[in-house]
């Protein structure tokens, strides 16, 4: 990733946009379309670096996949005819690819090695290895916690498992492995997490029963899978940057169309509503994932907020940009119970506080979150994404609060989830 980018966006931001397809759903659609025998088309997918890593892995397993500008076309021989790859399956910077594909590979009966970049090499994998081994998977890693992961054929058993962390990636690793289990599997959630794996299993004809915090899978659920086409909604995590930009920039009025508003992911909407920001949802649809158009307007008198409990996993990827939003509230905001942020691409608690404090804002990192005081952009300094796409985009939005350009090191990390992020912001600047 190259070094510094000088970022300057001029408000007000006015106009109507769409954001790239949802990253979580694109990953899962590629995986499920590849497992099914036949043709599946994914419309409006996210073509960021993470999702393209998932594409490359299934190509190496013998699936024909064609990536176009606005769709991914899959023609698969089916999971029974996957071939053994004769090279390491490289997941890049993608935690989703690493953890979900690991769960899937455990049941496939293929010997494989999964490895990612330096950042992935620091992220904990024991959280998936423990339940997968409980299912009789043969999976090992460095110090039983880090990539590369070595996966060997094993007969997968169904389990009853109580989640120890609120992590959709861990839950999904278990669910993908359970497709190959000889007995039913039951998972009890620790806290509600994004449910895209469950909704997309249903879309690809795999039976799954969800009752409050209990998820049940039948034995050998993989045998039910059928190919399917899927239209990917816009990613609410990407929309969040434009939502906050509109709320904090005088004179702004932004509408984002076709955004996924799955209730397990829509914490950002609840946060803005509680802060009394000017936000409206319309054009709502619900098949198979709920979507809406979201309009935001400049909101100078927002209230502070306490974020904890089940609101945290529902907004986990948005906490850095929410922290910036909270600096513009008229009182002190608190984020608690967000320890999960410590094991993302960076320690997002510390990185968010450190980078914003460099610019004159006032944030205090805590063991499990942040204390955010009303504060302003007071001085330009060279900041750094530390190769974390969400930190890079948050800092670009922070530049709206300054009259000067902001130098952001390692800014092209944003390409992981939002290629074309800056041009999209500039589009609203031009229309304004």
UniProtKB/Swiss-Prot annotation:
What Gene Ontology biological process does one annotation of this record name?
aromatic amino acid family biosynthetic process
Swiss-Prot/TrEMBL catalytic activity: 3-phosphoshikimate + phosphoenolpyruvate = 5-O-(1-carboxyvinyl)-3-phosphoshikimate + phosphate
Enzyme Commission number: 2.5.1.19
Query: What cellular-component terms does GO give this entry?
Result: cytoplasm
Q: Which InterPro entries match?
A: Enolpyruvate_Tfrase_dom, Enolpyruvate_Tfrase_sf, EPSP_synthase, EPSP_synthase_CS, RNA3'P_cycl/enolpyr_Trfase_a/b
Q: Which Pfam families does this UniProt record tie to the protein?
A: EPSP_synthase
Root EC class: transferase
Which of this chain's residues are annotated to bind phosphoenolpyruvate? 23, 95, 123, 169, 348, 390
List of catalytic residues: 317 (proton acceptor)
| Stored HAMAP family | EPSP_synth
**Which family is annotated?**
Belongs to the EPSP synthase family.
Self-association and partners: Monomer.
Q: What is the designated name of this protein?
A: 3-phosphoshikimate 1-carboxyvinyltransferase
- Underlying gene: aroA
């Amino acid at each position: 990733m190259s070094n510094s980018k000088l970022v300057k966006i001029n408000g007000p931001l006015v106009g109507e946009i769409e954001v790239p397809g949802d990253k979580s759903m694109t990953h899962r659609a590629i995986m499920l379309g590849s497992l099914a025998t036949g043709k599946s088309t994914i419309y409006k997918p996210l073509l960021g670096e993470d999702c393209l890593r998932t594409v490359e892995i299934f190509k190496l397993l013998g699936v024909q996949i064609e990536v176009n500008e606005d769709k991914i076309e899959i023609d698969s021989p089916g999971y029974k005819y996957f071939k053994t790859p004769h090279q390491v399956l490289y997941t890049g910077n993608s935690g989703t690819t690493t953890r979900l594909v690991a769960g899937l590979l455990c049941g496939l009966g293929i010997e494989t090695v999964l490895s990612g970049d330096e950042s992935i090499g620091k992220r904990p994998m024991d959280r998936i290895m423990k339940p997968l081994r409980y299912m009789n998977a043969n999976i090992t890693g460095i110090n039983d916690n880090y990539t590369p992961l070595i996966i060997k054929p094993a007969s997968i058993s169904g389990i009853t498992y109580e989640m120890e962390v609120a992590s959709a990636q861990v839950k999904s690793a278990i669910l993908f492995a359970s497709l190959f289990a000889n007995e039913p599997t039951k998972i009890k959630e620790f806290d509600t997490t994004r449910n895209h794996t469950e909704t997309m299993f249903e879309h690809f004809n795999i039976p799954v029963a969800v009752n409050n915090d209990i998820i049940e899978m039948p034995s050998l659920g993989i045998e039910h899978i059928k190919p399917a086409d899927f239209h990917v909604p816009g990613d609410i995590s990407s929309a969040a940057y434009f939502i906050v930009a509109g709320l904090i920039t005088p004179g702004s009025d932004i509408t984002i169309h076709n955004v996924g508003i799955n209730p397990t992911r829509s914490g950002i909407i609840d946060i803005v509503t509680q802060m009394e920001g000017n936000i409206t949802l319309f054009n709502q649809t619900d098949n198979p994932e709920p979507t809406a158009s979201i309009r935001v307007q400049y909101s100078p008198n927002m209230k502070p907020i306490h974020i904890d409990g089940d609101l945290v996993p529902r907004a986990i990827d948005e906490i850095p940009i929410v922290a910036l939003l909270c600096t513009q509230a008229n009182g002190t905001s608190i984020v608690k119970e967000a320890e999960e942020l410590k094991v993302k691409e960076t320690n997002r608690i510390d990185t968010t506080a450190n980078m914003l404090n460099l610019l004159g804002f006032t944030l205090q990192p805590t063991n499990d979150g942040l204390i955010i005081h009303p504060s302003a952009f007071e001085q330009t300094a060279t900041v750094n994404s530390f190769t974390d796409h969400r930190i890079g985009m948050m800092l670009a939005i922070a530049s709206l609060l300054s009259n000067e350009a902001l130098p952001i090191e390692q800014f092209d990390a944003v390409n992981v989830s939002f290629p074309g992020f800056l041009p999209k912001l500039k589009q609203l600047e031009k229309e304004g």
